[in-house]
């Protein structure tokens, strides 16, 4: 006999002490907190290298907020997908539970539906949090109420369509983040180019001395660096999430 599958003890979010989402849905507060920790940890690792090229791109004054937002959104997306993967692994464990009688003469009917439902209750602690068992329990309950076996297939189909729509909607946040990441990069591009153009205009106005021109050109190149670096960061982050 297989061991009871306890959602309250096996769900990754429940283990941490947060309210777990149903099926493969995630707790966005928890995933956001984990993403914030990852972002802070990444900047902590890069801080000693802020004077090098790889560190400068993340600590540049003009693009620091955008770089942090890009990294946070990327981390949030990865944490959500990782949590969903762990939850999917838990859902797959329901396939190992034996709920169908081994008797070859068993026939599903309103009278025998109760025995299957009882096995489900012994297989897991709460069928509502397991997609497979929730779907079966819902169909069996309708079978006992309606008394028509022929309606079970239609009930399964309706419930499957509902579950599919629910799963698709659970990816809306990830889709929004994937969309927002490169947009942030392009916003950084616009800000960087605006800074560079403004500095270049200042250079033209003070073009009387070469030393002043050189000093002002540093601001121009800094703005251009911000423009291209944030675009690169946004595109690379979106690519990592898509992979």
Label the predicted regions.
Residues 51, 55, 167-243:
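Helix-termination/interfacial motifs at the ends of transmembrane alpha-helices
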Residues 2-167:
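Large intracellular
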């Amino acid at each position: 006999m297989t061991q009871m599958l306890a959602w309250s003890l096996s769900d990754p979010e429940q283990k941490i002490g947060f309210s777990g989402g149903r099926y493969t849905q995630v707790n966005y507060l928890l995933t956001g907190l984990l993403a914030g920790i990852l972002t802070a940890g990444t900047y902590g690792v890069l801080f000693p290298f802020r004077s090098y090229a790889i560190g400068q791109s993340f600590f540049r004054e003009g693009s620091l907020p955008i770089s942090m937002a890009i990294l946070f959104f990327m981390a949030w997306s990865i944490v959500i997908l990782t949590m969903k993967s762990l939850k999917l692994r838990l859902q797959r464990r329901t396939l190992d539970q034996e709920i169908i009688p081994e008797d070859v003469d068993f026939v599903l009917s309103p009278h025998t539906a109760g025995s299957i439902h009882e096995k489900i209750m012994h297989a897991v602690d709460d069928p509502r949090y397991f997609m497979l068992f929730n779907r079966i329990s819902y169909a069996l309950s309708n079978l006992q109420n309606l008394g028509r076996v022929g309606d079970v297939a239609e009930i399964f189909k309706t419930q499957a369509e509902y579950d599919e729509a629910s799963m698709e909607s659970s990816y809306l946040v990830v889709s929004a983040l994937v969309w927002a990441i490169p947009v942030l990069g392009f916003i950084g591009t616009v800000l960087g180019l605006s800074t560079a153009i403004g500095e270049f205009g200042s250079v033209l106005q003070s073009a009387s001395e070469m030393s002043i021109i050189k000093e002002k050109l540093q601001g121009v190149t800094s703005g251009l660096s911000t423009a291209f670096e944030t675009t690169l960061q946004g595109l690379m982050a979106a690519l990592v999430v898509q992979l």
